[in-house]
Design a protein with these regions (language model features):
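Non-catalytic extracellular/periplasmic "stalk"
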Residues: 14-40, 53
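Structural recognition of the beta-strand scaffold that forms the well-ordered cores
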Residues: 41-43, 61, 70-72, 98-101, ...
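Flexible, gly/ser-rich surface segments that form the specificity/activation loops bordering the active-site cleft
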Residues: 81-93, 130-146
Length: 187
């Protein structure tokens, strides 16, 4: 009991950032955006070059072959679908995307889906693990992958991302790390 009290006091007095200045994520509401048992490598994490800076600071890229199943990371309602762009055109703004609004009015964005890769419809309710779409290589990118992020607003491409973590893999309180492969564990 004394240990528990000390631990809680330690948490309440601690800083809300890590030694490298990144926020420490305590609330893990999300699951990895791919099926249980599958594993993919993080090709770009939080606050990293070339593109996860500024408004995109808190985003994760997973290397995935075109056509890989992408699943809902949290319960919500489909509020936006764009799936009309071809893979590999390397044109900024041609990113196919599905956006899910959560109960707390945050938004999950599943970006770079393949042409006609949305496997949901507008206003559809999804729960963690439901199929959302198929990964791709649409828009400007360095190869086939899924770009996943969370925002508090949905006004367009430049919405500010917010920190998040996943409950069904190895915990990283400052975000997943580039070059590490993460298996989606049961939750």
């Amino acid at each position: 009991m004394v240990s528990l009290i000390f631990f809680l006091l330690f948490l309440s007095c601690g800083s809300d950032s890590s030694d490298n200045g990144q926020p420490i994520i305590i609330d893990k509401k999300y699951v990895l955006p791919y099926p249980i048992g599958k594993a993919y490598t993080c090709s770009q994490g939080f606050n990293s070059s070339p593109s996860h800076l500024g408004t995109f600071s808190y985003a994760i890229d997973f290397e995935m072959p075109i056509g890989t199943l992408v699943t809902a990371a949290r319960s919500g309602r489909i509020v936006y679908i764009l799936e009309s762009y071809s893979d590999n055109d390397q044109i900024d703004g041609h990113e196919n995307v599905v956006i899910v609004m959560h109960e707390d009015s945050t938004y999950a964005r599943y970006v770079h889906l393949t042409l006609n890769g949305a496997l949901v419809h507008m206003n559809q309710i999804v729960v963690p693990g439901d199929t959302v779409g198929l990964s791709g290589s649409s828009g400007t990118n360095g190869g086939p992958h899924l770009h996943f992020d969370i925002t508090k607003t949905f006004n367009g491409k430049s919405d500010q991302t917010i920190p998040f973590d996943f409950m069904n893999t190895i915990s990283h309180p400052v975000g997943l790390q580039r070059g590490v492969t993460y298996e989606a564990l049961p939750y």
